[in-house]
């Protein structure tokens, strides 16, 4: 592993550390009224300390200097020199955001000059009760190797010295990975009194079997001190979960000055003694350490997913061959083929789970967005997240960041009222935004809910009419007015600000979500609040599809979009004055879109008696009926993108390979409905 690989591993590790940092700050904030938990503060301190240690190894001076002051303020908090209150928590959140910016700049190699941490450094120093950090602090930040002569006592013991301790210390690889240095621990211990250090290398294997990433050395320490035992505990406070540690009080005995060349065998524990041995939670580091994980490049996972996808296609082709050969249903070949199909699907689901990632990091990023928007708008905001453990395809999470950012800013800017206005309305001064994620019916639902003013529909309609988006005499339903928010260039902001008013808004959000195979809907109650609901597929690699025939072509419709299938009666079909056809379903008139016609496969169908209608739900038209000729079956298909070879095809989401080797296009129901209801067609040559 070369330097660049180690550097990359450090920044990947920083992602987890930043997640722990933000999670800890949120937990402290949530328990502010009950008093913060010391262990939570310690966890936050450890995260910043580990980032600082790694940054120092790579000479990231700006990052080290900022992390040092951040760490100092956290140390003052855990030591009780400062108390946790809302202003301090707001400052710590800002510091975490700035630390994230510095990490990102260092990771990408971009200039850090545009990120000025000095203002926050001064604020952190002031919060810690210190003078502003200056040039004199530079020596504190240096990472210059030094030789420690630990066999020499740090100071002569006092006359009243009365304690002697045996310490067995075995660091794990995780201890070093977090940027800790055993020599620093030993130096702090030596400050407590006279100490003897013996190195045990008996676990060190032969060179051929040596794993350089593993920790093979054990240390046996003897400490004579007049300090209480808890002072020794505090030295190991931040590494006790990363090592095997045992501290035993001993009978008073001066430590030897000449260590043995080889370590003595560990003595049997006495039958009785003044105190029982004290062991750390990580005494057995193999069982108490976090679950072992392996970091794998995303490209490798994608290649594996593609191979498994080909395996599924191969299994479908084999099934088709067996069917064409007329093999009896309950024959041994069929049974083995069923086993193959089940195994292939299980492998596929397991591989897809590798790409699955908890949505928590994205929600934590939204907390930062909400804080920034709150500061810019001068509104009091509280963001609550639920369902952070919900797992979604990593690609979906990455592409959701921009839409969610815009929606959170919109909720702050347009939804939540100023504090004085909220008090006048009988609401609490702090506006509430709730961000929720959950699995439902094979999809992921994300809700962005605020308790603000709701959508001012008369104002929205007035703006749309003023921009010429709808006719002046148009009579629209509430749902149709809400849909105007998704039209390109629409904005209710009268002044351009850092948050909104530039005319690039919800239409971009809608397009981004639809590109993921998702839908977005609105529910708003004036004076109560607004809820945006995003429905997304679990993965972008496979989908459950209904295989249909359209004008002699085989196509696939996502099952997640289908509400109902039916064969209409002639009496249920009606023609409107505009010439458009609708079907009457349980008292409602549902628009009809002929897939064969809009894709140019054939002329429009005049009678739908022999056709099948697929009722699909869309954001714009709600229910709409897609006309197909026949339904073949329902199956899981592997998604193959078309953009690289053919570009964007209206009404088509992607393609797949069927069991007989044919290529079938996957219909994008939302786009197909838009094309059909607007009177458009799109011709495709085969």
Curated annotation (Swiss-Prot):
Pfam families (alphabetical): CheW, H-kinase_dim, HATPase_c, Hpt
InterPro entries with a match to the protein in the record: Bact_Chemotaxis_CheA (IPR051315), CheA-like_dim (IPR004105), CheA-like_homodim_sf (IPR037006), CheW-like_dom_sf (IPR036061), CheW-lke_dom (IPR002545), HATPase_C_sf (IPR036890), His_kinase_dom (IPR005467), HisK_dim/P_sf (IPR036097)
Positions carrying Phosphohistidine: 49
Enzyme class: transferase
SUPFAM superfamilies: ATPase domain of HSP90 chaperone/DNA topoisomerase II/histidine kinase (SSF55874), CheW-like (SSF50341), Histidine-containing phosphotransfer domain, HPT domain (SSF47226), Homodimeric domain of signal transducing histidine kinase (SSF47384)
EC number of this enzyme: 2.7.13.3
Segments forming domain CheW-like: 542-678
Top-rank taxon, per record: Bacteria
One GO MF term: phosphorelay sensor kinase activity
Protein's UniProt keywords contain Phosphoprotein: yes
Region (Disordered): 253-293
Xref: SMART domains: CheW, H-kinase_dim, HATPase_c, HPT
Catalytic activity: ATP + protein L-histidine = ADP + protein N-phospho-L-histidine
Residues annotated as domain HPt: 1-106
Residue span(s) of domain Histidine kinase: 290-540
GO cellular component, one term: cytoplasm
Coiled-coil regions listed in the entry: none
Keyword annotations of the record: ATP-binding, Chemotaxis, Cytoplasm, Kinase, Nucleotide-binding, Phosphoprotein, Transferase, Two-component regulatory system
GO biological process, one term: chemotaxis
Compartments where located: Cytoplasm
Function: Involved in the transmission of sensory signals from the chemoreceptors to the flagellar motors. CheA is autophosphorylated; it can transfer its phosphate group to either CheB or CheY.
Protein name per the record: Chemotaxis protein CheA
Species of provenance: Cereibacter sphaeroides (Rhodobacter sphaeroides)
Biological classification of the source: Bacteria, Pseudomonadati, Pseudomonadota, Alphaproteobacteria, Rhodobacterales
């Amino acid at each position: 592993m070369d330097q660049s690989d180690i550097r990359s591993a450090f920044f990947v590790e920083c992602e987890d550390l930043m997640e722990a940092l933000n999670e800890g700050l949120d937990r402290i904030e949530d328990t502010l009224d009950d008093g913060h938990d010391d262990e939570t503060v310690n966890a936050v301190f450890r995260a910043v300390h580990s980032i600082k240690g790694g940054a120092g190894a790579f000479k990231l001076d700006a990052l080290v200097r900022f992390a040092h002051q951040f760490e100092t303020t956290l140390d003052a908090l855990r030591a009780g020199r400062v108390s946790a209150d809302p202003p301090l928590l707001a400052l710590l959140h800002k510091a975490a955001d700035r630390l994230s910016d510095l990490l990102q700049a260092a990771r990408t190699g971009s200039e850090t000059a545009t990120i000025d941490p000095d203002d926050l450094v001064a604020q952190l120093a002031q919060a810690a009760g210190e003078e502003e950090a200056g040039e004199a602090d530079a020596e504190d930040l240096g990472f210059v190797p030094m030789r420690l002569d630990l066999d020499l006592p740090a100071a002569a013991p006092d006359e009243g010295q009365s304690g002697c301790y045996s310490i067995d210390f075995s660091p794990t690889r995780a201890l070093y990975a977090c940027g800790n240095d055993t020599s620093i621990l030993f130096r702090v211990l030596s400050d407590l009194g006279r100490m003897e250090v013996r190195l045990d290398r008996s676990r060190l294997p032969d060179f051929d079997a040596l794993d350089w990433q593993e920790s093979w050395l054990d240390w046996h320490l003897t400490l004579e001190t007049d300090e209480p035992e808890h002072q020794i505990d505090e030295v190991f406070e931040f590494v006790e979960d990363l090592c095997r540690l045992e501290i035993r009080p001993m009978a008073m005995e001066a430590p030897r000055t000449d260590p043995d060349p080889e370590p003595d065998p560990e003595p049997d524990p006495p039958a009785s003694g003044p105190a029982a041995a004290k062991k750390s939670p990580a005494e057995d580091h193999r069982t108490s350490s976090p679950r072992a994980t392996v970091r794998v490049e995303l490209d490798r996972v994608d290649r594996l997913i593609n191979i498994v996808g080909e395996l599924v296609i191969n299994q479908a082709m084999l099934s088709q061959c067996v069917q064409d050969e007329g093999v009896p249903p309950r024959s041994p070949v069929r049974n083995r083929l069923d086993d193959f199909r089940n195994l292939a699907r299980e492998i596929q689901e397991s591989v897809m789970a590798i790409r699955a990632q908890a949505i928590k990091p994205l929600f934590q990023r939204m907390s930062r967005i909400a804080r920034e928007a709150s500061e810019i708008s001068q509104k009091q905001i509280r963001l609550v997240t639920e369902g952070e453990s919900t797992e979604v395809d990593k690609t979906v999470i990455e592409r959701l960041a921009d839409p969610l950012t815009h929606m959170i800013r919109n909720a702050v800017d347009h939804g939540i009222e100023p504090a004085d206005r909220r008090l006048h309305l009988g609401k609490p001064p702090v506006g509430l935004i709730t961000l929720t994620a959950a699995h439902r019916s094979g999809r992921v639902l994300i809700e962005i809910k605020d308790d603000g003013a709701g959508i001012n529909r008369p104002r929205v309609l007035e703006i749309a009419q003023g921009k010429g988006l709808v006719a002046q005499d148009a009579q629209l339903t509430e749902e149709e007015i809400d849909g105007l928010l998704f039209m390109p260039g629409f904005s209710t902001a009268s002044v351009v600000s850092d948050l909104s008013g530039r005319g690039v808004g919800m239409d971009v959000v809608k397009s981004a979500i639809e590109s993921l195979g998702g839908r977005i809907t609105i529910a708003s109650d004036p004076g109560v609040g607004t809820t945006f609901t995003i429905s997304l597929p679990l993965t972008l690699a496979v989908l459950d599809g209904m295989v249909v025939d359209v004008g002699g072509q085989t196509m696939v419709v996502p099952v997640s979009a289908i509400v109902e299938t039916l064969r209409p009666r002639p009496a249920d079909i009606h023609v409107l004055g505009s010439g458009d056809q609708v079907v009457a379903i349980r008292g409602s008139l549902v628009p009809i879109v002929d897939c064969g016609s809009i894709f140019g496969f054939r002329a429009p169908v005049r009678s739908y008696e022999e056709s099948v209608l697929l009722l699909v739900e869309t954001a714009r038209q709600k229910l709409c009926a897609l006309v197909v000729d026949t339904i073949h079956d329902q199956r899981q298909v592997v998604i193959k993108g078309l953009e690289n070879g053919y570009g964007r095809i209206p009404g088509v989401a992607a393609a797949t390979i069927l069991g007989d080797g044919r290529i079938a296009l996957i219909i994008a129901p939302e786009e197909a409905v838009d094309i059909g209801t607007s009177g458009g067609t799109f011709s495709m040559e085969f």
